[in-house]
A protein has these predicted regions:
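Surface-exposed loop and turn segments in beta-propeller and other repeat-based domains
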Residues: 12-30, 163-167, 255
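Hinge/lid segment of periplasmic solute-binding proteins
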Residues: 285-342, 466-473
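Glycine-centered hinge/linker elements that transmit conformational signals in sensory
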Residues: 399-432, 457-460, 467-472
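Extracytoplasmic/periplasmic substrate-recognition and gating elements
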Residues: 460-537, 571-574
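C-terminal capping/gating helix-and-loop segments adjacent to ligand/active sites or protein-protein/ligand interfaces
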Residues: 542-614, 618
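Extracytoplasmic/periplasmic solute-binding protein
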Residues: 330-341, 360-412, 440-445
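Conserved N-terminal structural module of periplasmic/extracytoplasmic solute-binding proteins
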Residues: 69-72, 82-102, 112-114, 123-288, ...
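Short, solvent-exposed loop/beta-turn-alpha elements that line the ligand-binding surface or hinge
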Residues: 300-316, 393-414, 471-480, 599
Length: 622
């Protein structure tokens, strides 16, 4: 129905939207994607009609623009040939929508009388869920950490407002606009990871004077990109805004046109030079940068700050996390969460050993029937990168600036990685179900990400017995890699490091997991992990996974003590870290190793070259 109400909420008219009828018994559904008022105060509706027929290939899907007058009478109904995104009305009542043109995303005009599109302005690659038009009739849309104004004549983009500073996430905006009294308002929905619940709010913004601002101080948080948990922390702090507010500089903003690696380099350069930065975030693959800045003395020891705060102690944290985040006996960062990347195999194939060397793994693969794969999807560069991330301590000492890459152990790493394909062909006609291949022993291992108990039950079904989480081949005691969700540190330039830690401390509070959410990332606290495990054991319902035609469906069960022990053992014993080596060192190794892979040089010829180049790199960067 289209219903018209007066200002007091009394219904003035009601018009039924006719339910579309499909041919040959096809059942159609109708959905209204957006509603706007045009310059004549007609109601313009963006409608999607879709449905399935009796056969799988009989599918109907079309977009229409329906127009209703003030009394609810339909005055136009036009089919749109292309996908129609959400519509917006500017201050003159002209209707706009987004389309992709030759130069990227465009905001184009919509002729509601004919259902055709007019001229548009290129607005870049930024995706936005809502927008409004300001007093200059320019579009204002969320992007990065705030709202940006886009000139509707030139497409030029300028910062309009910092939303994060007001305690509102741009991604939470459902609608935003200027009320009749000139107030900027928005309807927002978001999930609070700190409160562990979904929240919907109507918010209004007010410009305040310096006197109203008072003596509040600003702390600057720098990040390559802002993940949801850290964003929630910033928003909560800024909403309270008692003594401090947190300003955010995001260098790699999703949806922006800047080159990713160039933006990352700008970010790391800023960390080294910008003395205004108080809090720094290293993303999931930024561990080598964390080491680099700690080595330069740019990160504060968090231990005394934790002791003064009192909400978390170093002894609360898994030792493996403390170890990888400690440099020169200082705890310089804490991840917001983590997972464990490892290899799992059938113990009937690899035995019950808890680790294996590269040579042992290579010998096993060479002893298997022809066509046996080590893992289903691993590539040459991918396996090489994982092995050097895991074994880097055996070959490279970042802190001392020394390396030993011209030895038999490293040569085995190159020999082993050479057994993998350069790239995996996903279109290969010889594709086989990975679970079938693993269960039959035609694939030795599978890459496994341990962040909850479900995956352990999957492999137990595949093998018919608990899997052996043997890890990647290594000379170390354990072959598991820690994948940090993101790590937070405090710079030595911070004027008030204690205030910085007090603001980030809620990220590390004891979690109860009462609502059963966010149970797919491991917490760094041992007591939170215990609570997470207890919640897994007492869930009201468990997911059912479909594996394949042979294995069928698998209904998850409460974890057994053996499964709990597997996760804990991998957490406690893991010493490798994803992203441990700088990209520059990995590139040197891969560049020189390519001559060995192609057969142009022997392994004995390439390792001295790798040793020489990495030595030069370490001396220059130290």
């Amino acid at each position: 129905y289209i219903k018209v109400y007066d200002a007091d909420g009394n219904e003035k008219s009601s018009t039924e939207i006719e339910q579309p009828q499909g041919e040959d018994g096809m059942e159609l559904s109708l959905g209204v994607n957006s509603i706007v008022l045009d310059k004549d105060e007609n109601l313009v509706c963006n409608v999607n009609i879709w449905g399935w027929g009796a056969t799988s290939d009989s599918y109907f899907d079309e977009y229409r623009i329906m127009v209703f007058d003030k009394n609810g009478n339909k005055t136009a109904d036009n089919k749109i040939e292309n996908y129609l995104d959400r519509m917006y009305a500017d201050n003159e009542g002209v209707i706009h929508t987004t389309q992709y043109g030759e130069n990227g995303q465009e905001m184009v005009t919509v002729d509601v009388a004919t259902g055709t599109f007019g001229d548009g302005v290129t607005i870049g690659e930024t995706y936005f869920s809502t927008c409004f038009f300001n007093e200059d009739n320019n579009m204002v849309a969320p992007s990065g950490t705030g709202l940006y104004e886009i000139n509707m004549k030139t497409g030029e983009k300028t910062k309009y407002m910092n939303l994060i500073g007001c305690g509102v996430s741009p991604s939470s905006l459902q609608t935003v606009g200027i009320l009749s009294n000139g107030t900027l308002a928005a309807f927002i929905t978001y999930y609070s990871e700190l409160d562990q619940k979904s929240i919907s709010e109507l918010v209004k913004f007010k410009e305040i004077t310096k006197e109203e601002w008072g003596n509040k101080k600003t702390l600057l948080l720098a990040c390559d990109y802002l993940d949801s948990s850290i964003e929630q922390l910033v928003l909560e702090a800024n909403r309270k805004a008692t003594d401090y507010v947190i300003d955010v500089v995001e260098y790699v903003s999703s949806g922006e046109e800047e080159d990713y690696y160039e933006a990352r380099n700008q970010y790391y350069a800023a960390l080294a030079s910008n003395k205004d930065i108080d809090i720094v975030v290293f993303s999931y693959n930024g561990y080598s940068s964390l080491q680099n800045f700690a080595k330069k003395g740019l990160l504060t020891d968090l231990t005394p700050l934790m002791e003064a705060n009192g909400s978390i102690k170093k002894s609360d944290i898994f030792d493996s996390i403390v170890n990888i985040c400690s440099m020169n006996d200082k705890l310089v960062a804490l991840p917001t969460g983590f997972g464990i990347s490892t290899l799992v195999a059938n113990p009937q194939v690899v035995g019950n050993g808890e680790s294996w060397t590269v040579k042992e793994a290579m010998d096993l693969l060479n002893s298997m029937p022809e066509g046996t794969k080590f893992t289903q999807y691993a590539t040459r560069d991918g396996m090489l990168e994982d092995l050097i991330d895991l074994n880097y301590r055996s070959f490279i000492d970042i802190e001392k600036g020394k390396c030993d890459l011209d030895n038999e152990e490293f040569k085995d790493v190159l020999r082993f990685s050479a057994l993998f394909p350069k790239e995996y062909d996903y279109d290969d006609d010889s594709y086989a179900d990975p679970y079938e291949e693993l269960g039959a022993g035609r694939t030795i291992c599978d890459t496994c990400y341990l962040s909850d108990y479900s995956v352990l039950q999957v492999y137990e079904r595949i093998f018919g017995t608990p899997g052996n989480y043997i890890g990647y081949p290594t000379s170390e005691e354990n072959g598991a890699l820690i994948n940090m969700d993101g790590a937070i540190g405090i710079t030595t330039n911070a004027d008030d490091p204690q205030a910085c830690f007090d603001l980030i401390a809620p990220l590390y509070k004891l979690r109860t997991y009462e609502d059963g959410t966010n149970m797919y990332s491991l917490p760094i606290r041992k007591d939170s992990f215990k609570n997470m495990t207890e919640k897994w054991k007492t869930k009201e319902s468990y997911d059912t996974w479909y594996l394949n035609e042979t294995l069928g469906e698998l209904e998850m069960q409460p974890p057994t003590q053996e499964q709990i022990d597997i996760i804990e053992k991998n957490i406690n014993n893991a010493i490798g870290v994803q992203g441990a080596l700088p990209t520059e060192i990995k590139n040197i190794i891969m560049e020189e190793a390519s001559a060995f892979y192609s057969g142009d040089k022997t392994v004995d010829e390439v390792t001295p070259l790798i040793q020489s180049r990495v030595t030069i790199y370490l001396s220059e960067t130290n």
